[in-house]
Amino acid sequence: EGPKAALMDALALGERLGFKTGVADNRVGWVEYGDGEEMVGVLGHLDVVPVGDDGWTYPPFGAEIHDGKLWGRGVLDDKGPIIGSIFALKAIRDLDLPIDRRIRVLFGTDEECGSSCVEYYVENGYEMPTIGFTPDGDFPLIFFEKGMTRFTVGGKVTDKGNIEVEYFGGGIAANVVTP
């Protein structure tokens, strides 16, 4: 429900700004600008990890501004970067900057739970970018995404003298464990 609403909002924004838009079965949407055979893909996502506990300073889905900062789920990961990328397309167009290929901002709806949206896009023959990047990261720029693994640790510790766990965090979604 939430990711689909975010998908429709992002597509509507692209349309209001006068861009070409498309959607793959409500799993992946895109906003596109430019001409040319080659396409730059800017890949992000609109879903968020489950809210979890009640320890929020501000309502998690409120998108409220406090002390000049926007607070809410997805502000940094990854709705904010997607909206920023769409407005970057607008700036490129409005400044009439020369580009010789298309730029497609792609936004999936389930990155936090396995990225089946990307698999769907690829497996159903939608156009693949010639080159791309993701704004889903930290500053300064990083040049790779972390991998994902799921595992269960079990058993008994028999040699307690060699084991020391200082901290192990986690959450509801697989990619929210922090060191």
Spans of features found by a protein language model:
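N-terminal helical capping/dimerization or prosegment-like subdomains
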Residues: 1-52
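Residues at alpha-helix caps and immediate loop-helix transition turns in enzyme cores, especially N-
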Residues: 2, 6, 81, 117-118
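Beta-strand secondary-structure signal
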Residues: 30, 104, 150-154
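Midchain, well-structured core segments that form catalytic/ion-binding scaffolds
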Residues: 112, 118-179
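Predominant activation on well-ordered alpha-helical scaffold segments within soluble catalytic domains
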Residues: 11, 83-90, 119-123, 154
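Active-site metal-coordination/substrate-binding segment of hydrolases
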Residues: 39-107, 113
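Short coil/turn connectors at secondary-structure junctions
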Residues: 36-40, 66-67, 99-103, 127-131, ...
